[in-house]
């Protein structure tokens, strides 16, 4: 079993209890991909990556957080939980880096390389990676699957125009916005 880092806690009175584990098995996949497939992390200037991050984060936030509010999944709830620093480290290193290495770097990047001669190959690669990312969130319910797929489009655009670091920053940025400004993880049904 993975170690529990945060015991079930309500971050706001209207939220479902949140708990967090240090899932150390999943990161092995991401780190392995970074070592074995260096092509998943194309190089972009920091300015280009920063612009791609801003664009991707704006789109992902409007689609995913706006969609979550429309679906009644979250509400405005600004806060800084006392577990915030631990959450930040876990989310950056063991969640977003790993998920983006797999979904954007390996899947979207790999498909982009294979489909580069097709007129819409880059778009197909982005959509396929986003759909698969959404499906990976299916255990949380159709709403989170839909919202993750929409967020995945923002992450995919950041990857396409700014590389893996932009996709990681976009994903991490959206997760931080969710934690700090909205009900986390979701409203109690």
Label the predicted regions.
Residues 2-95, 113:
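Juxtamembrane helix-loop-helix connectors linking adjacent transmembrane helices
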């Amino acid at each position: 079993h993975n170690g529990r880092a945060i015991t079930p806690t309500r971050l706001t009175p209207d939220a479902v209890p949140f708990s967090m584990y240090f899932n150390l098995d999943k990161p092995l996949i991401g780190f392995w991909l970074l070592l074995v497939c260096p092509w998943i992390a194309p190089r972009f200037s920091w300015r280009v990556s920063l612009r791609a991050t801003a664009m991707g984060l704006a789109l992902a936030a409007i689609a995913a957080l706006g969609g979550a509010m429309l679906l009644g999944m979250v509400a405005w709830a600004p806060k800084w939980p006392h577990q915030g620093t631990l959450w930040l480290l876990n989310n950056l290193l063991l969640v977003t880096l790993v998920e983006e290495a797999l979904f954007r770097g390996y899947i979207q990047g790999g498909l982009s390389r294979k489909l580069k001669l097709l007129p819409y190959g880059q778009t197909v690669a982005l959509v396929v990676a986003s759909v698969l990312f959404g499906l990976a969130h299916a255990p949380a319910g159709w709403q989170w699957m839909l919202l993750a797929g929409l967020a995945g489009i923002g992450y995919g655009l950041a990857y396409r125009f700014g590389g893996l670091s932009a996709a990681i920053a976009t994903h991490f940025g959206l997760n931080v916005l969710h934690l700090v400004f909205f009900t986390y993880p979701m409203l109690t049904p």
